[in-house]
Amino acid sequence: MSFVTKRNALISALHKAVGVPVLLASQVQPEAEPPLIVYSVTADYIPDGGLGNYSLGEGATQDDLVEVREEQPTATLSFTACSVNRCYDDKGSQVQVLGADEALELATLAQGFFLHTGRDAIAGAGFVVVDVTDATSRDALELDEMGRRFGFDVRLRYTRTDAAAISKLEKPTIKGNVKE
């Protein structure tokens, strides 16, 4: 399973857990209405310094050999919960939403997913949580108002597998004299 496939499964599970859109940052589609979470992959491959584990496997046919290399690097994803101050009508009464409070609660809920509640979904996506940072303010000025944002980073470990077809020698060709 590729890193992107694993990441998409993880993001889908997070979306189900928090109940708001979880969107990849810096995309060209219009941004959803708040509240929402945006994420970015700040590092998709941080090796641990090892060479990996090598093994031989069978290829497409019985005569093909494949050399398989596996390792367990880490990846860092950054999550930012976004909201704005706003009012809405709830059955005839005005309700005021403080964007900073909503963004912090959403960031805390997402942190809880990585710290505890989402452990089965995280493992099912092929990741193990290594570290979760604290949620800090990432407020940003949006035209005429402040976009209230709280964000945190998550470091995840996953298994990376690379495979390469290799040739095998049926009968070596020996040139020159062989001394016994």
Residue ranges and their predicted role:
Residues 1-66, 170-180:
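Small/polar-rich, solvent-exposed N-terminal microdomains that initiate assembly or binding
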Residues 1-5, 97, 101-104:
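Soluble non-cytosolic domains of exported or imported proteins
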Residues 105, 112-162:
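Acidic-leaning, charged glycine-interspersed low-complexity segments
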